[in-house]
């Protein structure tokens, strides 16, 4: 007899990560090319001495360090009670859905955006309301218009993954002010460290001025800890307490906690590395545009190529050139900004590809 499983799971897509192909240039997962700093490596090594013990389930030292760090970057002050820690910001996003939405409820987000939002909402039994993007970024007015009495959560991915675009700080603040206060607004800032050109919002300050705002951040991108899985949320104490209630115990390892604390202590040195990525982002974007590609202005560590029906061919031909990029259906391709020599290889391929495509028309 077959076990009875939840019917909703039958149509649930399995998450497909960016491919890793031996010998190929991987531009599919938005990983940093920089390894951990020596101080972070030392903290990880020291933490291995006690891996026979369970990690601190409350992540108390991490929360204290993050509260100081976030306070130093914001116009507002925060304590550990304002911080939740999770197994990457993706886990915290799932926890947010769990504490806000169930059967009959609605969760709003722009689309296309982070591809795990829809299944996370579906697993909770809620309904995902996907609001189409305008010019590859969030249409905040349309998202507000989509609010109903069933809306429980709104997610704003900023910068947006995979389109790399950003909502301007003033527009984000006005949006938050316009959302009914009983609806939680989650600002997913996995790529916030790559923001430049006056686009950096003081989103933690929005947490202190609006009780329904929570900010998600991660150590997987700019901090280079993707393999250790640690992220955090900044929110009001009641929201944080609810997140902690649905946290799966011990999922943030002692190694991850030690690395996170050491990374925060070396934040200035680590984040200085993002300048090199931003410079390469500008160069790659400019050269792709010069070659004939449409490239929305990026504020992340990747660029978006809205190739539509040409997506599959681009990805297939890139793989033949030993370059792995990330396709998104028939919408487009996301390309990670990597080391200069890897970016050069991508540019050589892209020029050849678009020349061949244009010549074949």
UniProtKB/Swiss-Prot annotation:
Entry keywords, A to Z: Aminotransferase, Pyridoxal phosphate, Transferase
CDD domains cross-referenced by the UniProt entry: AAT_like
Top-rank taxon: Bacteria
Modified residues (N6-(pyridoxal phosphate)lysine): 221
GO biological process: L-histidine biosynthetic process
CC cofactor: pyridoxal 5'-phosphate
Catalytic activity: an aromatic L-alpha-amino acid + 2-oxoglutarate = an aromatic oxo-acid + L-glutamate
InterPro entries on file: Aminotrans_II_pyridoxalP_BS (IPR001917), Aminotransferase_I/II_large (IPR004839), ArAT (IPR024892), HisP_aminotrans (IPR005861), HistidinolP_aminotransfase (IPR050106), PyrdxlP-dep_Trfase (IPR015424), PyrdxlP-dep_Trfase_major (IPR015421), PyrdxlP-dep_Trfase_small (IPR015422)
Gene Ontology molecular function: aromatic-amino-acid transaminase activity; histidinol-phosphate transaminase activity; pyridoxal phosphate binding
EC number(s) per entry: 2.6.1.57
Top-rank EC class of the record's enzyme: transferase
Gene3D superfamilies noted in UniProt: Aspartate Aminotransferase, domain 1, Type I PLP-dependent aspartate aminotransferase-like (Major domain)
Record's subunit section: Homodimer.
Database matches in NCBIfam families: PRK03321.1
Role description: Aminotransferase that catalyzes the conversion of aromatic amino acids and 2-oxoglutarate into corresponding aromatic oxo acids and L-glutamate.
Stated family: Belongs to the class-II pyridoxal-phosphate-dependent aminotransferase family.
Name of the featured protein: Aromatic amino acid aminotransferase
Organism: Mycobacterium marinum (strain ATCC BAA-535 / M)
Organism classification: Bacteria, Bacillati, Actinomycetota, Actinomycetes, Mycobacteriales
Gene behind this protein: pat
